[in-house]
From Swiss-Prot:
Pfam family, one: Como_LCP
MF-aspect GO terms: structural molecule activity
Superkingdom, taxonomy of origin: Viruses
An annotated GO BP: transport of virus in host, cell to cell
Disulfide bridge positions per record: none
Name of the featured protein: RNA2 polyprotein
InterPro entries attached to this UniProt entry: Como_LCP, RNA2_polyprotein, Viral_coat
The organism of origin for this protein: Broad bean wilt virus 1 (strain Spinach/United States/ATCC PV-132/1963) (BBWV-1)
Transport as UniProt keyword: yes
Amino acid sequence: MPLILLWFCFLCMIYVILKLEYTYVVKPFLKTAFLNTTSHYSDEYLREYSGIRWLHTFKEYREHTIFFNFPSFYCSPGSGIKHTLSELIKMEAERVNLTKTETIPKDILLERAKNYRVAQESNKSLLPQVEDLYEVSKWKRAISSLQKGEPSFVRTSEVAIGTMSGAGKMRIKVPVVKSYEEEVADMRLSQKVRAKADQIVVAAIEIVNDGFASVNSDVTLAASLYDKRHKTIASSFKGAYASRASGTPSHVVFYPTHRVAPGDNPNDTLELSAVSRDSDFDENFTLANFSVRTVYAKAKGPEVIRETQHLLNCKLEDLVKAQQFASDEQVVLALPRVYPKVNLDNYVMPGPDNVTKQEGEYSAKGIHFRKPIFNGSEIVLNATSKLPSSKSRGISKSEKIDDLGCMSDEEGIDYKYGQALMEEDVLEAQVDMFPLHNVAETMRLLFSGVSTIPMNVVEGTKISVAYLNELATHPGVHVPILNMLGRIPGSILARVHCEVAPTCGIGLAATYVEGNESAALGTDLGRLLGIQHVKWNPAIEPVKEFRFKPFSCVDWWNMHYLGSSKFSPVLAFVCLSKWINPPKGECKMSYALYFEPDIILPRQIASLNSVPSFMLRKELGTLSFKQGERRAYAFEVNFGKPQVEGKSVTLNFASAYCGLSQYMESDIVIDLTLMSSPMMGGTFTLAYVAGSYLKSIKNMQFLDALPHITFNFEKGGKSTRSLRFPSRLFPTYQSLDRWDLNASREDDVSGHFVLYQRDTVSSALEGDLVFRVSARVSGEPMMHGVSVGYPTTLTRATTGKMSSRSLGEKVRKPIGLAKGQAHMNLADYKRVFYPMAEWIYSSEKYEGRREDRDILKLLLKMRLDGTKATEDFRIVHSPLVRVLQNCAWLRGTIHFKIVVRANSEMMSYQRTSQVHVTAHENSLSSNEFFSGMLTATSGELEFSKEVVGPVEGFSSMGWNVQGNKKFYKLCIALGNVHEYEAVKVMASFGDDVEFAGQQKAGHYALERGVSVFKEFKY
């Protein structure tokens, strides 16, 4: 008996050993060998698909090829198909009705267009057990829990992650582990010690969504799972699925091959994006609840984990599908119409940064998927393209595409083509603007205020400032309606009331500047006065109206696009002078802003071949005439020169635009605004003198023989006198590109004006007669010639051309009284490149020595509108740069050129450096739209870019408009700074460039003040 028991135990042990060996050794080996051979496929099947590249297994290749070939159908006797394909084509041409059995079966079509994944409706979890995914026994799991360093495997219970409201959009984190506290690696430890911490390796994730829509509804939802650590959809995409939002909860399992490093929170790495397009749920209710279950392993690394063949197959299948769904290297699997459960035509899903849109072409031969299209932050789950014409596909008319049958519940052909979003019921917002018209002025009030004019004001003092970006916050009657409108027509009216005694006098101005930060402009009138402004004396005109165009490039404006708190357009009320005979008490000024929907001011848009005359205006300065004396002042009107007052130089839009040309032919209007008391009077004459400045005036009859205008200021009339000089009075074209700013240089002007008194100023009041002088262009100005202008530096002072300039090239002599060139054409601009920035090598600034062949890399960075650059990269203020800095809006093409000059002291065989030039859309961290490499010692690179903005194509240059990008950035990487001598950046405007409006003007100070007016007695 004991011997029998012993034999029985021996046989049991042998059975257990053989069982274990068969389960873990023999069976996996046979299964792998069987799957890696073709013996289980028929010979006919292999012959049909001979020559096809294998992808792990033949079955997977058939499911994941780029082009799905439909099998040719064999019509066996007695089958439902009674005609061959050629007979069907002939019958279709003869308009013979076909039954469903005589078309390509729908189930075969759907099989070939197999969707990425459709969730299964079930009340039970579909998540596999740990044993199905990892090769681990119960004994081994028990031992691993006792031993430190062994991998541990966890299957979590259901964890609620979030809800989707009736609005139909949701984006929420997907927790991988139940709790993360135990996974934290101590950051105080060394990197070598922290590397021994456990990683998280996720094997499977089950997403469960429980929809609460009515059972008889067809509300659907779709979701995508992605790794938020990646920036591109090709890398981050982990899977997508679709399901109903009603009835039984839906389950879907993904095998994401997801690993998380020690120290990183695994619950922050995955994100689920879900959307319900056809939801008719109220957004105050919950449409669906989402929960998750996971199977993951904790281990030092993946090499200590043994995955089952089932997990390997599932991971590979998910990987192939994800690549086909989301990679820009491959094509995209289209999600089919699953009728009637889920209708997913053109389903749009929010995704991470870069996502794709896929389209497929259905034909009798198969389904062909094109390259995916990147489309913002949306994924079109099912987009089937419209069949192209036979001409575009190169198919003759005889090769007619077979009818694929109907994929919906209706009869007939049903081709669907995808869009980013396609809705059946669209509610359109009302855009009727009837409340804006025929409304009383008091109902059109936007803003009102009261300010005091102090006794100690000086020239340039700002009395009051109204930022337009704050209009939406004021409690005006129509402000809520204006907040609702996309485009508000017309302009804005500013009305000012200021009552001053006629014995007093002061000059005021209301000015509107786009992109102006008033607090940083100081008291310089050249910067404060924009293209749109008006001047007056409240002692003469107690009420003044000023209409301005908020968007100078279009005929509308919007409450919500009026800049930010940093850069915004501003309406400012400015003093043109100090008080002249001030009042005894304080003086107040009240003003109000109204919107004018029926008054549309002309657009302020200039191009290279035309410019509105009202955009070219220039402040000349203030003149004072004492009582009992007679004086005369000579001054030049050169719109190409910047505005100068003392040491302050202002580069406004007029000087920047006119600096692009050599000469101008136009009428000139001189505006004189009386700023002293109207009870002071005098008679004045303004005459034009051709040639250089007069040295003295001995006889008034000499000036009376010249073209002149005699005027005085009327009592009770207007504050400003305007004097026009037609262009035919000027013997030569008006010079625009003069170098000298000082009026004392007598030989550098082609013509000038002389303002002199015919009588002396007399009044019972004390003080001087003071008025402000400005000039503007009238009529249709014509530009002649193209000029690259002169550089404007801090050394440009009273003596004209200074010896301290460091430009690299010799400055040409200014043209004297020569006649101008032929009329300017756009071809001239194509041949002229303007300097933008330059860098010159200096051995003291950089480490190493050129003689020792030291290597030092240098990056030169700048904004291509000439506003910012690295320290040694000097901005050159050419006319092109000044136009970019001073215009408020810009659109069109700009051509750029980078010229690199190598050091001539080094031999060619000693050079190893290269120059890499990149241009970026926004910041240097964004993708570059141009990348060029210069391998020669010296050379140049060229590229072009079209400037486009959100306001009818105009990009805002001086103020923040939501949705508008910053200007382009340039980065020049010098491989070895010691091998180069200089780098220059140049630019040229294209034919389609247009400028609009003026932002805050450029400004710099001189070392010594200059005089614009040359004074002499007579």
